[in-house]
Regions:
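Residues immediately within or flanking Cys/His clusters that coordinate Zn2+
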Residues: 9, 27
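Short cysteine-rich clusters marking metal-coordination/redox-active sites
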Residues: 12-15, 30-33
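Cys/His-rich microdomains that often coordinate metals
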Residues: 16-19, 37
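Short Cys/His-rich micro-motifs in 6-15 aa windows
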Residues: 34-43
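Short coil/linker segments at helix-helix boundaries
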Residues: 43, 47, 93-140
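Alpha-helical segment of the N-proximal tetratricopeptide repeat
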Residues: 45-72, 76
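Short, charge-rich amphipathic alpha-helical segments embedded
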Residues: 68-102
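Conserved N-terminal substructure of TIR/SEFIR domains
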Residues: 143-217
Length: 217
């Protein structure tokens, strides 16, 4: 019977929770968000810490900084499929959001490319060095990302531009609504009444899932 090991440096790519891993396995399911995902080969603490740092940065949408660390991992071990996959997630600005209907984590793209993810050299290297279990997940996620990208490009081409973009902070550090958000709401209604097309996230995106709202921004 395989024992489970907890590696404090290995975090969930979707929610950041600590993963409980079966020894010698290359995929794991997060006990916090329930997402099955690929995991890297951890040969030592240095590699584990690098993956953790890169993942933390990506979860904070600091994609360029995260990509630098994934490239550093590749420099240490060019057979790390997860490092190449991490680079892909950064190139496309992937963030995982919770679907309010299914409660599953789904990808949303903060960056757009006209090229298919499957044509990317880093994707090809991730597939090359992945085992069967990892390939299945990589290919499924890549397909989902490609569909999102197509949707983004379609919306971007067809959506009429906004006259005004209202940017504000919704909540403060304690989670309470900010005064700015109240003011933003008033400004939105005032400008809308005056005939302007206004982008105001709280209303413009209220019926959009995370993976769908990025094109409008």
């Amino acid at each position: 019977m395989k024992g489970k090991i907890k590696m404090s440096t290995l975090k969930c790519k979707m929610c950041g929770g600590t993963l409980e891993i079966n020894e010698n396995e290359t995929t794991a399911t997060c006990e916090y968000c329930g997402t099955e995902q690929t995991i890297p080969k951890i040969t030592d603490d240095v590699v584990g810490n690098l993956f953790n740092r890169a993942n933390t940065l990506r979860l904070k949408s600091e994609f360029d900084k995260a990509e630098e660390i994934y490239n550093k991992i590749v420099g240490l071990d060019n057979t790390q499929s997860e490092a190449y996959w991490g680079i892909i997630l950064c190139k496309y600005g992937i963030e995982y959001v919770e679907d309010p209907t299914t409660y599953k984590r789904v990808p949303t793209c903060h960056r757009t490319s006209y090229d298919a993810i499957t044509a990317d050299e880093d994707y090809k290297l991730a597939i090359q060095y992945a085992d069967i279990s990892q390939k299945i997940i990589y290919e499924a996620v890549a397909k989902a990302i490609d569909e999102i990208q197509k949707g983004i490009l379609t919306i971007s081409q067809n959506e009429k531009p906004y006259d005004v973009f209202i940017c504000y902070k919704e909540t403060d550090e304690s989670g309470k609504r900010t005064q700015d958000s109240v003011l933003a709401n008033d400004i939105y209604h005032q400008l809308t009444q005056e005939g302007f097309k206004v982008f105001y996230a709280a209303i413009t995106l209220e019926d959009k899932l995370g993976q769908e709202y990025e094109p409008y921004i």
